[in-house]
Regions:
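GST-like domain detector, emphasizing the conserved glutathione-binding G-site
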Residues: 2-148
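Short, well-structured alpha-helical interface segments that form or flank functional binding sites
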Residues: 25, 29, 87, 91, ...
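Intrinsically disordered, low-complexity polar regions and short flexible loop motifs
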Residues: 234-242
Length: 254
């Protein structure tokens, strides 16, 4: 007999944008995961400058360090059904599999290593090229209070103005070519064994890649030449992939 969903919605902490709700690749993967598992949740939107205080308030662990200080990031979930607060995407995914074993698995037995390998290959090939193309425009979709925080922290991280990070001319063409090669190799994998990374059912790696594509779409804008380029890579296979993931999007504004 299928068990009923947990009585209390999980609280999912996310970063808002000024137009579309969810945009971050890091939080998108957990939004996908919660919807895939059919777990009720509600979103609590938190602006960038308030993330650290919110994490400390609810007892979320830091996910790294910055300037020798604890770094607090989203996604974070707070599960009133178990009393657990979990931060960091993969840790949240494993927690959801363990806490709700009667829901579809994000890490089916024996697949975690392969999932990691597929995503690592994609990011190793395309990551260095995509970051300077996609990170700077994020500042344009954030709410007012988050814009200066994002600009200050990222410019310190990258050592220059956001606008100066965006490659131009031949450098831009080269960056796009690196991205194209990486994502077309991924699209070929889907064609050979899909519709998802490991076959007929999505897994956590699919939600990670789907989150990246959502990030591109929202941040670059669907009318941008960059998104138009992405949309035709692999004969449109990436757009079909996003469409295949659509049942697990839910409402990105809610």
């Amino acid at each position: 007999m299928k068990k009923s969903p947990p009585p209390n919605p999980i609280i999912f902490y996310d970063i808002p944008s000024d137009k579309v709700g969810c945009w971050s690749p890091n939080t998108w993967k957990i939004r996908y995961a919660l919807n895939y598992k059919g777990l009720p949740f509600r979103t609590e939107w938190v602006e960038y400058p308030d993330i650290e205080a919110k994490c400390k308030e609810i007892g979320a662990e830091p996910t790294g360090t910055r300037d020798d200080k604890p770094l607090y990031t989203f996604p974070v979930i707070q599960d009133p059904n178990t009393g657990r607060v979990v931060s960091d995407g993969p840790k949240i995914a494993r927690y959801l599999d363990d806490a709700y074993p009667d829901t579809p698995k994000l890490f089916p037995p024996g697949t975690e290593e392969k999932q990691d390998a597929v995503f690592a290959e994609l990011i190793q090939k395309g990551g260095p090229a995509l970051r300077p193309l996609v990170i700077p425009p994020v500042v344009n979709i954030l709410n007012g209070v988050s814009k200066p925080y994002f600009r200050t922290t990222r410019e310190k991280m990258f050592g220059g103005k956001l606008e100066e990070l965006v490659p131009q001319g031949e450098d831009r063409k080269a960056a796009l070519e690196h991205m194209r090669e990486a994502f077309e190799a991924f699209a070929k994998r889907l064609d050979e064994g899909g519709p998802f990374i490991l076959g007929d059912k999505p897994n956590f790696a699919d939600f990670i890649v789907g989150g990246f594509l959502q990030w591109f779409r929202v941040t670059l804008g669907e009318d941008s030449d960059l998104w138009q380029a992405v949309s035709v890579w692999g004969n449109g296979r990436l757009l079909k992939y996003l469409e295949d993931l659509r049942p697990y999007e839910g409402n990105p504004r809610a």
